[in-house]
Every structure is written in structure tokens, then in C-alpha cells.
Amino acid sequence: MQGKKKLSIVVLSYNHQEYIEQALEGIFMQKVDFPIELILCDDKSPDNTHEVIEAYLKNTPPHIEVKYTRHEQNMGSTPNFYYALRQVTGEYLAFCEGDDYWTDEHKLQTQYDFLEQNLEYAICFHQANNVSPYSELDGKPFSIIEDRDYTPLEIYQHWVVHTATVVMRSATLRTLAFKETLNDPTLQYFDTAIFLAATTLGKMQGFSKTMSAYRRHDAGLSFGAVNFRRDLKHNHLDTIIGNFYQGKIKQHSDWQIFIRSYNDFFQTLKQGQFATAFQFLKWILKHYKKLIIYLLKKIRH
């Protein structure tokens, strides 16, 4: 492994006592010919996640350097993510949430080799399967990924890239796109934003092979019942992304915000949540003129 570029893996955990061991097992089983830096950050889980982590880390393979932090105070998912990224020293970067896991022992080597051999690419990802108590989701693909290049607009329009499937160049963290779109600690989501930032460095490749599992459960950050506060934060992120990238991404951003706000406005109104309904109404009024102009231009063409 001497002379090989290092790969950093960011793992965030919170209340993952039932899952974190499987996440670490998927990392430790990787067959690679390069050094690994594991950056594991537990956000002061009130359950036994910390104890499970400490016990499992005793079996760390020799080629993996562990940087484990258990925060003294709960930071929240996004500040915890920013904290973890500041620890990255590898030239490549991978992710695995504490409740997801990798299923293929050659996952990292496959993606590492691709980026080493194809310098024009900055990021690659693969297919993942859902693991869920809901039969309509369990065992099915998170999204259908093809062996081809993907565009920034594609991954923004359609939620196709799951975080645990990605390996990217860590130079992404030094791009203007990263600095401009991922500097707000109140953001609820950060995965799509960092994937888009990577595409400012180079191309993006998809692999059809399934090499990880996405655990979908009600406690997950991006899965569960309708959450109006979450949707307001999603509007905020879409605004940041649209304002930076402009063009078709900006058009889609405006459309997403309008549709989400329109639907949530009527739902909150029916539920008597008038203050929240008013917040969605402000988003609607802010974007409907832009959408009318956009639709008129499209009709003319």
C-alpha cells in the first residue's frame, strides 16, 4: 500500500445502536490495495451507539486509520457532517451513514480504480437496494442506475444517487461550489449539494452493480411521514443550489419549491397550522411569477 493514495470514509452516527455494527462490518470487509482513513463521528447518541462502536473498533484492520469522535454535546446532522469533513486528509472520499451498509467487498477498490484510471471524472456511484420493514420497498433498488455518465441536472431532478454509493475526489471540498452551497449549519440535506459540487471538477459515472444497502425506516433523516419543517428547509437548500448553478438547475429549483409549497400550503391549512401555511404561501408568491415567465418562454419555443 506504500505510495498509494489514501481514501477517507465519513460515517455519521446518531441513535444507531442497532445498525452501526453492520455499517462498520461493511467497511472492515473491504479488500483494497490502498490505505483508508475512517472518520467516525457520533453526535452524542443517547442510546448505546458509543459502546457498540468502541467494542467493534477493537477489531480494526491494520490498513485502516480510525479518527473517532463522540461529541460532548449534540451538534445536529449538518454541523456534524461539516466537522467530519474538516478531518479528511485522503485524496478520495466515500460516505456511509451509520444505519446503511456496504454489501460488496470490492466496492471501494472498484470505484477507486475507476477514478485513478479516468482523470476526467470527479465522482462515481452505483446502485443500492432498499432494506425496509415495508414490503413495497424491501429488497427493491433505491433507483435504477445505468452504466453511463450522468449530468448534474439529472441527479438534481431525480433522487438517484444514494450517499453510501459515492466515491469522489476530496478536492471537491476546496471548490467554490462547495464553499458557496455548503456553508449553512441549518441545512437539513447536504448529499445532493456535495455531489453537484463534485461535478464542477469533472464528469460523473454511474455503475449498475448493486454494492450497498439503504436502510429506510421512520427514524431515518430522509424517510418517514410528511414533515412540514423539513420541507421548509428543503426549500432553503433548493434556493441556494438554484442561485449558484443557475440555468436549468435554477428553473427546476424554482419549480420544486413552488410545487412543494403549493401542496404543503393546503395541507397545513386543512390541519389548522396557519402560521406554517403562511410560510408556504410566502414561498408560493415568491416563485409563481418566475414560473409563469419560464412557462411562457417554453410555449414560445
List each model region and its residues:
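Glycine-rich, basic loop-to-helix element that forms the pyrophosphate-binding segment
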Residues: R70-V88, T110
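Conserved donor NDP-sugar-binding/catalytic core segment of glycosyltransferases
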Residues: H106-G139
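Catalytic core of nucleotide-sugar-dependent glycosyltransferases
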Residues: L187-Y189, T210, Y214-D218, F223-H252, ...
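Conserved short acidic donor-positioning loop in nucleotide-sugar-dependent glycosyltransferases
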Residues: N15, I27, D43-K44, M75
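A conserved acidic beta->alpha catalytic loop
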Residues: D42-E51, Q73, E97
